[in-house]
Structure formats: structure tokens, C-alpha cells
């Protein structure tokens, strides 16, 4: 969520209005994913991570601060993050398939959206190439 949200706020450069709008949309979708996951964790009798410091420690996909606000850089950072998320959700789907149907369903739904995000970031990269 935060990587897309803050990226939308600081973006500068090529296709900025389009990148900003897409990042805002992705941020909303990522927050929705977090909501689904928190609900599932609670359904399983566990507690979601409460301390943001723990997010960093336990995250398999790392947050990269948008220290360079250039849209090309931001799109690349988000593409890397999407690919990591895709790999993680695929692993979760593989682990849960035929065993935990609800976690599989939620993970598969998130995976589908992450694949869409990846395509949208790749489309921006193709658009940026047009300006060379």
C-alpha cells in the first residue's frame, strides 16, 4: 500500500498524471489485499502483525523508499515489488491447494490482481521507451 501511495504523492517526470492515477488505484487494491489477509489470519485464530517494525522484519518482499521521484524509477521499483509479491502468493497458493481452500481462494484472488499490476507496470515501461 504505502509504496504505491507515497509514490503517487512524489512522482515526477514522464506520464506523471497517468502514473499517479495508477499508483493510487494500486494503493487502494493493496490495502484491500491487506484487509483480506488480516481477516483470514483472524479467522484462523491468529493475530495480524500489530507493530510496523515487525512488518519489515518478517516481510519477504522489501519496501524501497522512493528517494528518486522519477516515474521511470518508481515504476521499476514497483515492478520489482510486484514480481516478489507474485512469487510469494504463488508459493502460498501451491502450499494451500487442496488443503486450505479459503486461504487458497484469497491468495489466488490477490495473485490475479498482482499479475495485473505487473502488466500495468510493464506497460508503463513500454510507454517510457516510446519517448527515447
Region spans (language model):
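Iron-associated oxidoreductase/ferritin-like identity signal
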Residues: 1-132
Amino acid at each position: 500500500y504505502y509504496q504505491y501511495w507515497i509514490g503517487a504523492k512524489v512522482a515526477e517526470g514522464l506520464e506523471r498524471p497517468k502514473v499517479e492515477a495508477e499508483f493510487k488505484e494500486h494503493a487502494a487494491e493493496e490495502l484491500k489485499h491487506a484487509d483480506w489477509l488480516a481477516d483470514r489470519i483472524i479467522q484462523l485464530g491468529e493475530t495480524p502483525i500489530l507493530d510496523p517494525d515487525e512488518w519489515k522484519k518478517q516481510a519477504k518482499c522489501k519496501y524501497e523508499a522512493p528517494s528518486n521521484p522519477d516515474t521511470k524509477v518508481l515504476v521499476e521499483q514497483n515492478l520489482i515489488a510486484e514480481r516478489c509479491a507474485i512469487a510469494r502468493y504463488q508459493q502460498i497458493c501451491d502450499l494451500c491447494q487442496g488443503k486450505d481452500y479459503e486461504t487458497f481462494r484469497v491468495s489466488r484472488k490477490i495473485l490475479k490482481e498482482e499479475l495485473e499490476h505487473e502488466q500495468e507496470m510493464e506497460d508503463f515501461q513500454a510507454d517510457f521507451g516510446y519517448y527515447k
